[in-house]
Regions:
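Conserved polar/disulfide-associated segments of primarily extracytoplasmic proteins
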Residues: 58-144
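Short, surface-exposed beta-strand/loop micro-motifs that present aromatic residues
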Residues: 147-155
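C-terminal motif of bacterial Sec signal peptides marking the signal peptidase cleavage site
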Residues: 13-16
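Post-signal-peptide N-terminal segment of Sec-exported extracytoplasmic proteins
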Residues: 34-65
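Surface-exposed amphipathic alpha-helical segments
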Residues: 160-195
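Bacterial signal peptide processing site
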Residues: 18-21
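A mature extracytoplasmic/lumenal domain signature
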Residues: 40-42, 50-52, 86-88, 134-138, ...
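Bacterial N-terminal signal peptides that target proteins for export
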Residues: 1-9
Length: 195
């Protein structure tokens, strides 16, 4: 095997070790040498094509298990994404909440990038999870998605995790369900990362 093909094989092998999906509802992401397990709420499964790890952190997308080909679950139009930072949270959840509800902070919560179109509808810390409901009436980068989303911020395995629940523009996801999904994801993820 030539030197350049050996290097390609090594890179492919190493990149393959960055993620694994040990169960339909779980993705293990190796970030900066540490594995962080992200566990979906009941009825949601990993979209295997979505799992990604870079120097900036990790990402995974969960949707209804019936849509990903796995058995079980009730039909839901919600999609849940989770991003894991390579570091922990700088400061407290209350400090993060204060920043994200300011004009400059709002821009990071929406999708449109239009600060004037983004409104923080609700914000609270429950069970060590910062929950924020966002209404973004700007141009959406993804067609067919509701302008209302819920974001959850928490720490698991020493890493900052940001989770988002999005629903379809028609029908959407109720606030109760969105908060429940974020709470379940945070609790399951924390439990999976206890050392």
């Amino acid at each position: 095997m030539s030197t350049w093909t050996s290097k390609i094989a090594i890179v492919a092998l190493l990149s393959g070790c960055a993620t694994s999906i040990p169960a339909p509802d779980r993705a293990d992401l190796r970030i900066e040498g540490q594995v962080v397990s992200i566990v979906a709420p009941a009825g949601f499964c990993v979209d295997p094509q979505s799992v990604d790890v870079t120097k900036a952190g990790g990402f995974v997308l969960f949707s209804d298990c019936a849509l990903t080909g796995a058995a079980g679950g009730t039909v839901s139009t919600a999609v849940i994404s989770a991003s894991v930072a390579p570091t922990g949270l700088n400061g407290t959840l209350v400090e993060l909440q204060k920043f994200l509800t300011t004009e400059p902070g709002k821009i990071t919560l929406g999708r449109s990038g239009d600060m004037q179109a983004i409104t923080v509808v609700e914000s609270r810390v429950v069970d060590d999870v910062l929950l924020i409901k966002v209404d973004d009436r700007g141009a959406q980068p993804i067609r067919g998605v509701s302008p209302e989303i819920w974001r959850g911020f928490f720490v698991a395995g020493g890493r900052a995790v940001t989770a988002t629940v999005s629903g379809a523009a028609e029908g959407g996801t109720s606030d109760i369900h969105a908060r429940r999904y974020l709470g379940q994801l945070a609790a399951s993820t924390r439990a999976a990362n206890k050392t």
